[in-house]
Amino acid sequence: MRSWTLLLLPLLLTACPKTAAVATAGAVAAPGAEVLTVSTTPDGLTEQKVDLDRDGKPEITNYFRERTDAPRLLLRKDTDLNRDGRIDVRAEFDDGGQRVKEQLDGDFDGRADWVDHYIAGKRTVSEVDTDFNGTFDLFKYYESGVVRRKERDSDGDGRIDAWEYLNEAGAVVKTGKDVDGDGKMDVREQ
């Protein structure tokens, strides 16, 4: 991820809550922001475009499901971090308000370079395109919020050829390699 992307993350963190339930409390998450438009999408969701810097262009687009028996429910939040008009971060939520997926375009080319998957609001898998070539080549698997296994396609052939197993503290405890290109671990080291 480019270093200046990290400078824009405070915008994302103030604008994207951990769960959709937090976002339903108010129409705008950031002080001073302005709701530009509210409309209905073809699939019946309420689309809300939010301008954080009051330049007349939306940096955030929220997609809500309106409910009669409960407050509106945030299903998706799209964020334009670098203000180029393209989505840089997309967060998706389930009907319980829990995050289910988040995608980040770290090099601002219009393609997701990092995708996190969540179950019951906890991250379970991350897919990462480490060289920004459009193909995910690193996969991280989480247990209780901690990376416990990493799988990597280091030669770009579409098959996993390196594995790392980590303990609860994040230290590597075992590694493996595929040396013959069949996608199966041939060499194990502890």
Range-by-range predicted roles:
Residues 16-190:
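Calcium-binding acidic motifs and repeat modules
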